[in-house]
A protein has these predicted regions:
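Intrinsically disordered, low-complexity segments enriched in serine/proline and basic residues
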Residues: 1-7
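Short, hydrophobic/proline-enriched secondary-structure or compact coil segments at domain edges
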Residues: 14-23
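Acidic, metal-coordinating catalytic segment for phosphate/diphosphate chemistry
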Residues: 49-93
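Short hydrophobic/aromatic beta-strand or adjacent loop that forms the aromatic wall/cage
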Residues: 16, 91, 164-168
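Conserved Nudix-box catalytic region and its N-terminal flanking loop in Nudix hydrolases
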Residues: 35-46, 97-134, 139
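Unchanged
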Residues: 119-207
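Conserved beta-strand and immediately adjacent loop positions that scaffold enzyme active sites
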Residues: 93, 102, 189
Length: 219
């Protein structure tokens, strides 16, 4: 898997935990990483777990809020307290490269994305990642690499807030292939994108996908 060591100019350091609401985020971090350098953010202090639902409601009802920072001396404990307020689900996907160093992207819901999907009952999460890439792009015989990162994305379904944890793996593919986007999953295109051509694609994607590329350059 090619390293993304040349991408530093395009991305900023990721705080400890980001929970994405489409293109907005609640960020749980240490006090020194909080909103002081981010003019578009609001900083809120979590007194106890009972505050979490009201923070989520505030964020949902205020679309002009791009980011809420929750500073904490113990970000892991705070993150766990936030997670229990959601119905948690697991998913996995892959950052796939070929022998030329091109990356496999898909077009879904009008934005560029990486192939991913939900974990099935009893399935190892790395198996989920390979299966979903195969199903969504038609690429098989993938070589599984290291775990890159886990991203968090929340959404409301049937009146219930869900928090999706997505495990992202490096993958490689060495043979020619005819890409076959999974149209029943609203995927309209699958394409190999050269490293040099990535910036405009990454301007037309989700922040969580940018995070995957950011973390991959550190792998």
């Amino acid at each position: 898997m090619p390293k993304l060591s040349n991408f530093g100019a395009f991305f900023k350091t990721i705080p400890m935990h980001r929970i994405y609401f489409d293109k907005r985020a609640i960020i749980i971090c240490r006090p020194e990483e909080a909103a002081l350098t981010d003019p578009n953010a609001v900083e809120l202090h979590l007194r106890n777990a009972a505050d979490v639902p009201s923070y989520i409601s505030l964020f949902e009802s205020t679309p002009t809020l791009d980011r809420i920072y929750i500073p904490s001396d113990d970000p892991e404990s705070t993150y766990k307290a936030v997670c229990v307020e959601f119905k948690e689900v697991n998913a996995a996907g892959g950052l796939v490269s070929n022998r030329r160093g091109d990356f496999l992207l898909i077009r879904r819901d009008g934005l560029w994305d990486l192939p991913k999907g939900h974990q099935e009952a009893g399935e190892d999460i790395s198996v989920t990642a390979i299966r979903e890439v195969q199903e969504e792009t038609g690429v098989d015989n993938l070589i599984l690499g290291d775990l890159i990162c886990v991203t968090d994305h929340c959404y409301r379904r049937n009146g219930i807030w869900h928090l999706k944890h997505t495990w992202w793996y490096q993958m490689t593919y060495d043979a020619p292939v005819d890409l076959s986007p999974q149209t029943e999953e609203d995927i309209t295109k699958a394409a190999w994108v050269a490293r040099s051509s990535l910036p405009p694609f990454l301007k037309d994607t989700y922040p969580s996908i940018k995070e995957v590329f950011t973390e991959a350059r550190q792998a």
